[in-house]
Amino acid sequence: MTVRILAVCGNGQGSSMIMKMKVDQFLTQSNIDHTVNSCAVGEYKSELSGADIIIASTHMAGEITVTGNKYVVGVRNMLSPADFGPKLLKVIKEHFPQDVK
């Protein structure tokens, strides 16, 4: 199985696109089987079926609701692996250990 990440920002064109690339690089270097997509906060509900983890800024993460085996990771600096990396790895190792190589 591959853990599916969805990067979310206000309009889906700026921060989430860059965050998508940063998360992809980080997870590749961390040997995690993954896919990463991005969208605007207003579109995340239509993208939920293809995501296991939603990653967004802390203020936006509070607006995102998920159920079942889906998780939201709120980060202060969406572009810094030093900020999002440990939080994302914690969720992956706890809930998706089969994707850690």
UniProtKB/Swiss-Prot annotation:
Residues 3-96 form the PTS EIIB type-2 domain. The keyword Transferase applies. It catalyses: N(pros)-phospho-L-histidyl-[protein] + L-ascorbate(out) = L-ascorbate 6-phosphate(in) + L-histidyl-[protein]. The active site is at residue 9. The modification Phosphocysteine is found at residue 9. It is an enzyme of class 2 (transferase). It holds the Pfam family PTS_IIB. One of its GO terms (cellular component) is cytoplasm. InterPro entries: PTS_EIIB-like_sf, PTS_EIIB_2, PTS_EIIB_2/3. One of its GO terms (molecular function) is protein-N(PI)-phosphohistidine-sugar phosphotransferase activity. One of its GO terms (biological process) is phosphoenolpyruvate-dependent sugar phosphotransferase system. It is found in: Cytoplasm. The keyword Cytoplasm applies. Keywords: Cytoplasm, Kinase, Phosphoprotein, Phosphotransferase system, Transferase, Transport. Induction: Induced by L-ascorbate. Repressed by UlaR. PROSITE patterns: PTS_EIIB_TYPE_2. Its main location: cytoplasm. The phosphoenolpyruvate-dependent sugar phosphotransferase system (sugar PTS), a major carbohydrate active transport system, catalyzes the phosphorylation of incoming sugar substrates concomitantly with their translocation across the cell membrane. The enzyme II UlaABC PTS system is involved in ascorbate transport. The PTS EIIB type-2 domain is phosphorylated by phospho-EIIA on a cysteinyl residue. Then, it transfers the phosphoryl group to the sugar substrate concomitantly with the sugar uptake processed by the PTS EIIC type-2 domain. This is Ascorbate-specific PTS system EIIB component. The gene is ulaB.
